[in-house]
């Protein structure tokens, strides 16, 4: 009887630990599938009170130049239509788990901004991922192809959503308040 009780108690103690490991980390999913064309994007319209569309464009232009400027000058600013288009890259955090390790990763995406009085719209689309694993495999895939239900794919999806949300949040702060000017104050 004591042995049976001991086995039952040990199983009860192990169960919460096993359930906690199966639980996926919570994060806000911002990259969603467009049902009309099947592609994935992060799109949002942000209301801005008391700032003209020209001023929003100017603030966004300065922020993009200071954060996404590259040697190939791939940023397109259209001052007549008040639009900005850019391709940008962010780096994924390395991670590992049982039987897998992401040794490096990059996410490329296209950023489009449009400005109107009282609001602006941004779209992050054409999301592509390049991931290198510890076994030597390097894969380049679109976000649509990162929908596998394994640990590396879950990590990559989480990283992409968190990084794009952080970019959108920082950009919103700069466009609304004109912040970010203290960056050169070293």
Regions found by a protein language model. Give the residues of each.
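Ser/Thr-rich, low-complexity intrinsically disordered terminal regions
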Residues: 20-186
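Bacterial Sec-dependent N-terminal signal peptides
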Residues: 1-22
């Amino acid at each position: 009887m004591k042995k049976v009780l001991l086995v039952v108690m040990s199983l009860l103690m192990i169960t919460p630990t096993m359930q906690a490991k199966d639980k996926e980390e919570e994060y806000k999913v911002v990259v969603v599938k467009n049902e009309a064309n099947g592609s994935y994007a992060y799109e949002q319209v942000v209301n801005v009170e008391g700032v003209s569309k020209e001023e929003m464009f100017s603030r966004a232009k300065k922020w993009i130049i200071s954060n996404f400027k590259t040697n190939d000058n791939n940023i397109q600013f259209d001052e007549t239509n008040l639009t900005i288009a850019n391709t940008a890259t962010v780096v994924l955090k390395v991670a590992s788990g049982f039987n897998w390790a992401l040794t490096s990763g990059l996410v490329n995406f296209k950023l489009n901004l449009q400005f109107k009085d009282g609001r602006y719209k941004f779209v992050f689309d054409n999301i592509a991922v390049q991931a290198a694993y510890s076994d030597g495999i390097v894969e380049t895939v679109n976000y649509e192809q990162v929908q596998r239900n394994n640990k590396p794919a879950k990590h990559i999806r989480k990283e992409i959503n968190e990084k794009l949300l952080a970019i959108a949040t920082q950009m919103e702060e700069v466009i609304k308040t004109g912040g970010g000017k203290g960056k050169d104050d070293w």
